[in-house]
Amino acid sequence: MSEIVDIYAREILDSRGNPTLECEVFLESGAFGRAAVPSGASTGEREALELRDGDKGRYLGKGVLQAVDNVNNRIADELIGMEASDQVGIDQRMLEMDGTEFKSNLGANAILGVSLAVAKAAAEEAGLPLYKYIGGANARELPLPMMNIINGGAHADNNVDIQEFMIMPAGACCFAEALRMGAEIFHALKGVLKAKGYNTAVGDEGGFAPNLKSNEEALEVIMEAIVKAGYKPGDDVLLALDVASSELFDKEKGIYTLENEAQKEKTPAQMVDFYENLVNKYPIISIEDGMAENDWDGWKLMTDRLGKKIQIVGDDLFVTNPKILKEGIQKGIANSILIKLNQIGTLTETLEAIEMAKRAGYTTVISHRSGETEDTTLADLAVAVNAGQIKTGSLCRTDRVAKYNQLLRIEDELDTTAEFKGHNVFYNIKK
């Protein structure tokens, strides 16, 4: 009864007002799954290709009608009649149809929309919530959230170089408590920024996006907000950064440029010095993309210097790609991977990357993109694989809060079997 009888895609809008693809899959039993595909602003060079129409007279060239057509007139014909429960077989069939390394034929947005909608339809057919369908009986760990409360870089129109300044309420006893702590700190931060005369407009991911005197001032105002909300930095709340340093790197010169620092140009070694100083001064537990995706020597230097003290997360570096992750593991680069479904383009390959990371002792962080929708798949995925951490933006904007609300529902449903590990999610770091 899980046979696919129809697949339909349409063009919808994401949280930035850009088109994206939504897909629906219908089964013989009447079960149904719907999924919408996110889109990134700072993207890795080796990400799977997001197919855009390029017609400047329509949505400024960002339409996805070709990807929609690929679903409705190519993928649908191939998959109708297959069993939705055969996730690996379905994903493999689409990869064979595409036939390219980066999914540039059908488009990763077309393939991912179908892949996720199939999983949702199969879960409904099985009478299971998505997290249990994907993860089985052991899917019960609620993730520690990385909450992006100050936005900079490519996510905001301000002078802050570092793309994301995040809080992690690791001292909470459960996910609901962590969410409450994050929301209270977010509101306290608004008051701190207002008192200093700073703008409290928000960026793509719902964090504040003020012009600040330096990147370090962002950490100072967050520390002040944590205390103002009644919490203790380092015990109750940890800090995390996403530098998105590929955006700051001159490949030819081998130099990073941080416009908001006194010493603007930095070598990879000086960048590590910069991070080490911040880690020694503030309760920073995690730095994502501290080096550019092509600066593997810089990554090795950073991992050797800081990899025992903090979580070093590869995003643009690994692009959720098992082949690239394998190379990084072999070379001892980073100790954590950021997981973004649309970087690789199928649920099967995403699960493969997560499994590979865990076997190597790397932590995993399930992540949204800056262009999001109301789709909450990644919340279910975080619990399904017991990832331990999730990164899905700030404490405002429905496209971000939708994921947090889904995690509240899951925690409620799991009841006494739910786990929340707090500080203990960083199992590969010496305390």
UniProtKB/Swiss-Prot annotation:
Q: What is its main location?
A: cytoplasm
Localisation: Cytoplasm; Secreted; Cell surface
Cellular component, GO annotation: cell surface; extracellular region; phosphopyruvate hydratase complex
Sorted alphabetically, which keywords does the UniProt record give? Cytoplasm, Glycolysis, Lyase, Magnesium, Metal-binding, Secreted
Cofactor or coenzyme needed: Mg(2+)
Q: Which SMART domains match?
A: Enolase_C, Enolase_N
Q: Where does Mg(2+) bind?
A: D242, E288, D315
Q: Does the keyword Cytoplasm apply?
A: yes
A Pfam family cross-referenced in the UniProt record is: Enolase_C
| Protein EC | 4.2.1.11
Give me the comment on cofactor binding: Binds a second Mg(2+) ion via substrate during catalysis.
Binding positions for (2R)-2-phosphoglycerate per the UniProt entry: Q163, K340, R369, S370, K391
Identify the pathway: Carbohydrate degradation; glycolysis; pyruvate from D-glyceraldehyde 3-phosphate: step 4/5
Q: Which reaction does it catalyse?
A: (2R)-2-phosphoglycerate = phosphoenolpyruvate + H2O
The record's InterPro entries line, in alphabetical order, gives: Enolase (IPR000941), Enolase-like_C_sf (IPR036849), Enolase-like_N (IPR029017), Enolase_C (IPR020810), Enolase_CS (IPR020809), Enolase_N (IPR020811)
Top-level division of the source organism's lineage? Bacteria
Molecular function GO terms recorded: magnesium ion binding; phosphopyruvate hydratase activity
Q: Which residues form the active site?
A: E205 (proton donor), K340 (proton acceptor)
Q: Which GO terms describe its biological process?
A: glycolytic process
Q: Give the NCBIfam families listed for this entry.
A: eno
Q: What does this protein do?
A: Catalyzes the reversible conversion of 2-phosphoglycerate (2-PG) into phosphoenolpyruvate (PEP). It is essential for the degradation of carbohydrates via glycolysis.
Instruction: Kindly give the HAMAP family that the UniProt entry links to this protein.
Output: Enolase
Q: Which family does it belong to?
A: Belongs to the enolase family.
According to UniProt, the name of this protein is: Enolase
Q: What taxonomic ancestry is recorded? A: Bacteria, Pseudomonadati, Thermodesulfobacteriota, Desulfuromonadia, Geobacterales
